[in-house]
């Protein structure tokens, strides 16, 4: 993917990732090639030999995404040099069973299939790459962040590959599974009091950085590398997967990096697209009062600097019951194990789809998996 074929802002993020300070080259070597119906028949049928399978070629239609690209070469699986090269190019699923008749089509990008298990792998890469390029993060340095968990996992995943120490501050209310994963990846995790919220965790992180010249605060709530990376990668993937045909995009807002980056790209490339931000009860994005909520990953007690209000057409508030109810429906009806923020995003997407009506298209993201919240009783309404 030559940078000028994707978008002019993508350059800093693409390229094989060498040591800090090394020049980078194209990162297109890991895009898989396609398998046509005849090839698939031969592969599955063992080239027609003993035990071959009979396959109806007419039922082998293209996947509803652009993960597979056309090629005359024999398809083969690629080998990555490190785990970070496997972030992105996630598939998109059309939610055919959950969407009611007469509503717009709804497509969900399954970001829990990133190696770190969430969409936050992308923000982590974008933030670290820019910090290296600007000289803010040097070899042997320490990455510090306040996180609900997923960004911390992404930072730890990259830190272990890049030789950085990672120190994270996580409010106690967030799931233990995520904390265990961060620690397994070598991160030092400090739990902060629930009463202090994310603002308290951020304050603790900034205090640590102030006393350590080798430490870098990732700052996902204010670092514009967060939305910029989504603009350069996630948005482009979604646009290509949908062949540029999208009428509304609906995303949960925590840092709002995913929303802001993708909405900005779509506004530039899909005229008339409607961008909808999703927040949970107790969030102040739409001017409400801060308060408690069970949904993890979205809902803020302050307005992040990474929220671009200029590309936001609407904010939909989804309460805990509707978010967790949709999580159960996604699992039981679509076979999708979504986290609670994904449940909220899909619930809001269904509202938008009903309004738009048949023939229109709504795109959303499922940021992470329900497996990350089993201790929080995600299928029983959460705790």
Each language-model region and where it sits:
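Basic polycationic patches enriched in arginine
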Residues: 6-9, 31, 59-61
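Intrinsic disorder/low-complexity segments enriched in small, polar and charged residues
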Residues: 34, 40-43, 54-57
